Design a protein with these regions (language model features):
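Conserved beta-strand hairpin/beta-sheet module of binuclear metal-dependent hydrolase folds
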Residues: 27-76, 168-188
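Active-site neighborhood of phospho(di)ester-bond hydrolases with catalytic His/Asp-centered motifs
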Residues: 51-54, 82-94, 114-117, 185-189, ...
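Pre-active-site segment of Zn-dependent metallo-hydrolases
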Residues: 47-91, 98-102, 165, 191-205
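Active-site HxH/HxHxD metal-binding segment of metal-dependent hydrolases
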Residues: 74-145
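Bacterial Sec-dependent signal peptides at the C-terminal "C-region" and cleavage site
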Residues: 12-26
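Bacterial N-terminal signal peptides that target proteins for export
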Residues: 1-9
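Active-site-proximal loop/helix segments of hydrolase catalytic cores
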Residues: 160-227
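Binuclear metal-ion centers of metallo-dependent hydrolases, dominated by the metallo-beta-lactamase
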Residues: 127-153, 224-273
């Protein structure tokens, strides 16, 4: 494979040791705001996407989105105004709250909502929803993908079944998001096995940032290197009692990986002038 040119990045707020840079010279900075558990707000230039950020429950020791973030998320106010797409990976309560999604759709006439079909079915089972034409149920075929364009944002839904060892069955979808030249992968709670990842050939996607559960790094880092091959790793899905030991454990397996632990913390990835 030919070698592409590389640039040098600075990560403000968190130092990344040994991280590989984003390589698309035209891409503006990527900003990530941690919402809770696997929830993030992604911003690249004027494009904004939220993934797994609308949930209210503390489930199995995972933190809910705090009120100072959840309120603006539900009402499309403050920094949460102007989000063009909200994505949910699966229906578990530490990733999805029907009440919160319905509130956002009712208060925001622009946003599109993308989720596995069983999540959309749950949403609609609770009664009529605002702007149903902006709700997209996604069911990729086994090992397959579905491509969606939302206001010029290219989103690919990947069939990545839920990790069967951690919580009850759920239809889990991973997402590839292309924001102004930056490619981001969010896997939800996908099963970290080669069987699930190999069909997608993700190294060919040249992923700039992969957002994965912490156990992907502490228990399955070889899979991430071989079947995702991201330039930068962001680890989340932490428990309320997580300590700095978790950061050390992640750093030992993947030097330079960032662990998101405090809701509201923000990362900004800049290029040197």
């Amino acid at each position: 494979m030919p070698t592409r040119p590389r640039s040098v990045l600075l990560l403000c707020a968190v130092a990344l040791v040994g991280a590989r840079p984003l390589e698309r010279q035209s891409a503006p900075p990527l900003e990530i705001t941690y919402l809770a558990n696997m929830g993030v707000l992604l911003e690249v230039g004027n494009r904004r996407v939220v993934i797994d950020g609308l949930h209210r429950a503390e489930l199995d020791g995972t933190p809910p989105v705090p009120p100072d973030l959840l309120g603006p998320l539900e009402t499309a106010t403050g920094r949460m105004r102007g989000v063009e797409a909200i994505l949910t990976t699966h229906r578990h309560l530490d990733h999805f709250a029907s009440r919160s999604v319905r509130a956002r759709l009712a208060s925001d006439p622009i946003v599109h909502y993308l989720a596995p079909s069983e999540v959309v079915d749950t949403l609609r089972a609770h009664g009529p929803v605002s702007f149903p034409n902006r709700i997209h149920g996604l069911t990729p075929r086994p090992g397959g993908r579905l491509d969606v364009d939302v206001a010029g944002i290219r989103i690919t839904a990947l069939d990545l079944p839920h990790n069967p060892t951690r919580t009850p069955r759920a239809q889990n979808v991973g997402y590839l998001i292309r924001l102004n030249g930056v490619t981001i992968l969010h896997v939800g709670d996908a099963d970290p096995t080669a069987e699930r990842y190999a069909p997608h050939n993700l190294p060919a996607e040249h992923i700039d940032v992969a957002i994965v559960p912490t156990w992907y790094i502490t228990e399955s880092s070889a899979l991430v290197r071989q079947h995702i091959a991201p330039r930068k790793v962001i680890a989340s899905h932490v428990w309320l009692d997580a300590t700095e030991k978790l950061r050390r454990d992640v750093d030992r397996e993947w030097p330079g990986a960032v662990v998101l632990m405090r809701p509201g913390e923000r990362l900004r990835i800049d290029r040197e002038p």
